[in-house]
Amino acid sequence: MLKKVSKNTNRQGRHQRVRNKITGTSQRPRLNVYRSLNHIYAQVIDDVAGITLVAASTLDEAIKSQVEASGNQDAAKLVGELVGKRALEKGVSTVTFDRGGYIYHGRVKALADGAREAGLKF
């Protein structure tokens, strides 16, 4: 009998294939997205140094106070704007977008649009 592979396992495989091809450097770090059922997280990562330069999520107090629900596109857009603003404050203007194996649609797209509106280039 065949065993069904979970969607999350497939996503992790897609993410691993992409991660083999892209890395974040200090000049152009990687904007990584993680999506859970209730929250969304974004990090700007320098893979060469192995450090997270900037992070934002729907768990931040600045976003929690602005939204009623944290698992929707409005909250994701606010996270994108916040991570973009924090990255620009740290001197990061261009990034490589790592969608984390998720389809570029819905919350992931809203986060990317918010980061672009904040001034990040990718």
UniProtKB/Swiss-Prot annotation:
<feature type="region of interest" description="Disordered">
    <location>
        <begin position="1"/>
        <end position="22"/>
    </location>
</feature>
<keyword id="KW-0694">RNA-binding</keyword>
<dbReference type="GO" id="GO:0003735">
    <property type="term" value="F:structural constituent of ribosome"/>
</dbReference>
<dbReference type="InterPro" id="IPR005484">
    <property type="entry name" value="Ribosomal_uL18_bac/euk"/>
</dbReference>
<dbReference type="Pfam" id="PF00861">
    <property type="entry name" value="Ribosomal_L18p"/>
</dbReference>
<dbReference type="GO" id="GO:0022625">
    <property type="term" value="C:cytosolic large ribosomal subunit"/>
</dbReference>
<comment type="function">
    <text>This is one of the proteins that bind and probably mediate the attachment of the 5S RNA into the large ribosomal subunit, where it forms part of the central protuberance.</text>
</comment>
<dbReference type="GO" id="GO:0006412">
    <property type="term" value="P:translation"/>
</dbReference>
<dbReference type="InterPro" id="IPR004389">
    <property type="entry name" value="Ribosomal_uL18_bac-type"/>
</dbReference>
<feature type="compositionally biased region" description="Basic residues">
    <location>
        <begin position="1"/>
        <end position="20"/>
    </location>
</feature>
<comment type="subunit">
    <text>Part of the 50S ribosomal subunit; part of the 5S rRNA/L5/L18/L25 subcomplex. Contacts the 5S and 23S rRNAs.</text>
</comment>
<keyword id="KW-0687">Ribonucleoprotein</keyword>
<comment type="similarity">
    <text>Belongs to the universal ribosomal protein uL18 family.</text>
</comment>
<dbReference type="GO" id="GO:0008097">
    <property type="term" value="F:5S rRNA binding"/>
</dbReference>
<keyword id="KW-0699">rRNA-binding</keyword>
<protein>
    <recommendedName>
        <fullName>Large ribosomal subunit protein uL18</fullName>
    </recommendedName>
</protein>
<keyword id="KW-0689">Ribosomal protein</keyword>
